[in-house]
Curated annotation (Swiss-Prot):
Residues 1-204 are annotated as: CPSase. It comes from Buchnera aphidicola subsp. Baizongia pistaciae (strain Bp). Composed of two chains; the small (or glutamine) chain promotes the hydrolysis of glutamine to ammonia, which is used by the large (or ammonia) chain to synthesize carbamoyl phosphate. Tetramer of heterodimers (alpha,beta)4. L-glutamine binds at residues 57, 252, 254, 281, 284, 322, 325. InterPro entries: Anth_synth/Amidotransfase, CarbamoylP_synth_ssu, CarbamoylP_synth_ssu_N, CarbP_synth_ssu_N_sf, Class_I_gatase-like, CPSase_GATase1, GATASE. Keywords: Amino-acid biosynthesis, Arginine biosynthesis, ATP-binding, Glutamine amidotransferase, Ligase, Nucleotide-binding, Pyrimidine biosynthesis. This is Carbamoyl phosphate synthase small chain.
């Protein structure tokens, strides 16, 4: 295939970034004109900008890429993790007007314009990252308009950065109705149907969509799972009517403590001991349902190079991370065992209920983008469902 370099013409317009602490950056706008507010976080990934931008977990946030050149390989239709960009805005040092890759179908510039995303470029992202690392994540404001009063801007930022005004972000990104995701799985929906080719049981997994990424669903279907994806506020009673083999609690945005409806359902599932696997927000929700506490981190974990240690085997895996909240290590309930910790800050990365078929992981084992080290956790979930299923069969016999 002929290697082609494609260049997009850009019309540069001045843009301004204002942080909650009063710091001001002046740069150029390469997205749509307008203004946006959001919590500013930084992501240290060098690749995978398309997957990051389309991750629903970034809802209500403004993403800062620490890597200086973004957009070099363009955009393709297959690597989006959701249908739209949920982030409120984007901050970069430079968006390349030249893109080249055999899979690319359009430029990042055009994609951002089509998605109506406000972007500021040509600012010192290293300086911004150092500020966020020191002060913690801050609310901020990006505008292409002339600012007449910084004081009024800061007042509005302070209003938005108030827990009382924060909305339930999960319900904004969750599906509104049940749907089936059955890629690569036998089309028949029956818990006792086996895949004729693989001679294995098809596992019916109910996925709670708190902001689920497409590749998570693919990882499960690749392991012979038939998926029913459901709204975040679905009751346990409705779920149990469709006879799942296991429950998957997905990633998602915001503070898990606002998802009381999910906690009610998880507690019901724990009571009957159905297999549960939670990641990211789902990990935090399982911890809350088990009696643990959640705290907000200073600037969170956002990147694809985070080392995590598995305590049982003493091995290290490099993982993809995207979260601003973590499970509090103080006063953990006795029914929870810590399975993984971060080698960056010692925070909890994995939990296992010692009295139930339930476990969770703070990172993103689907690795989109990121390393594949933690994909084995999906296999662990399959083994857990097999164990539960075999136990039920023995009871019936």
């Amino acid at each position: 295939m002929k290697h082609v370099l494609r260049k997009e013409k850009t019309l540069e317009i001045s843009a301004t970034l204002v942080l909650k602490d009063g710091t001001i950056f002046y740069g150029k706008s390469v997205g749509i004109q307008g203004e946006t507010y959001g919590e500013i976080v930084f992501n240290t990934s060098m690749t995978g900008y398309q997957e990051i931008l389309t991750d629903p977990s970034y809802s209500n946030q403004i993403i800062t890429f620490t890597y200086p050149h973004i957009g070099n390989v363009g955009i393709n239709k297959n690597d989006c993790e959701s249908n739209v960009i949920h982030a409120k805005g984007l901050i970069v040092r430079d968006i390349s007007s030249i893109y080249s890759n055999h899979r690319s179908q359009m430029s990042l510039l055009n994609y951002l314009l089509n998605q109506k995303i406000i972007v500021i470029s040509n600012i010192d992202t290293r300086k911004l990252t150092r500020i966020l690392r020191t002060t913690g994540s801050q609310y901020g404001y990006i505008t292409t308009k002339k600012i007449h009063s910084i004081i009024n801007v800061l007042k509005h930022i302070n209003i938005l950065d108030n827990p009382i005004t924060n909305k339930d972000l999960v319900k904004q990104v969750s599906t509104k109705k049940f749907y089936i995701w059955k890629k690569n799985v036998n089309k028949q929906k029956n818990n006792n149907i086996t895949n004729a080719k693989l001679k294995e049981k098809i596992w019916h997994v109910v996925v709670y969509d708190f902001g689920v990424k497409k590749n998570i669903l693919n990882m499960l279907t690749h392991r012979n799972c038939y998926l029913t994806v459901i709204p975040a506020d679905t009751s346990a009673e409705k779920v149990l009517q469709i006879l799942p083999d296991g429950i998957f609690l997905s990633n998602g945005p915001g503070d898990p403590r606002s998802c009381t409806y999910a906690l009610n359902a998880i507690n019901a599932f724990l009571k009957i001991n159905i297999p549960i696997f939670g990641i990211c927000l789902g990990h935090q929700l399982l911890a809350l349902a088990s009696g643990a506490k959640i705290i907000k981190m200073k600037f969170g974990h956002h990147g694809s190079n985070h080392p995590v240690k598995e305590l049982k085997s003493n091995t290290v895996m490099i993982t993809s991370q995207n979260h601003n909240y973590t499970v509090d290590t103080n006063n953990l309930p006795k029914n929870i065992n810590i399975t993984h910790i971060s080698l960056f800050d010692g925070s909890i990365q994995g939990l296992q209920r010692n009295d139930k078929h339930a476990f969770s992981f703070q990172g993103h084992p689907e690795a989109s983008p990121g390393p594949h080290d933690s994909m084995i956790l999906f296999d662990k979930f399959i083994k857990l469902m097999k164990k539960s299923y075999n136990s039920q069969q023995k009871t019936i016999i």
